[in-house]
């Protein structure tokens, strides 16, 4: 009888310890999409800034946000925003590919007047200069296909 009580007590203690340990470890992890780089930017902020700059045709900002933007010879480095449009209602699906790459699927629900509904795929990568949008061009179709049929790591919208 004493052995049975001792076994139950040890089993209960072990379960409680495992539960406590898993809760402690789970809370210490930061979602990659919310992680800040040295400049204090998150991948999500970079993606949203890029989407806004693209809508406003703000080449100057786009070149700051993309990898190797300073080497670009197509976009005008001095061209700021050509309008002040913004997406008021959107939904974003976030797919963490690995610790250095996050893919975003941006969907505008109600685009600004005279603008078509926008569905964009944007790849944000970690660089030695912080998080950057990988390229002004959309990711390759095979890269999109790799994540599009999986469950998003996270979802958020303009209402969050």
What are these regions (language model features)?
Residues 72, 112-114, 140-145:
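A short local loop/turn or secondary-structure capping micro-motif enriched for an aromatic residue
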Residues 29-75:
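Core segments of small alpha/beta cavity-forming domains
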Residues 21-24:
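C-terminal motif of bacterial Sec signal peptides marking the signal peptidase cleavage site
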Residues 78-126:
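Surface-exposed, charged secondary-structure patches
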Residues 134-160:
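Low-complexity, intrinsically disordered terminal/linker segments enriched in charged
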Residues 51, 66-69, 96, 106-110, ...:
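A mature extracytoplasmic/lumenal domain signature
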Residues 2-13:
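Bacterial N-terminal signal peptides that target proteins for export
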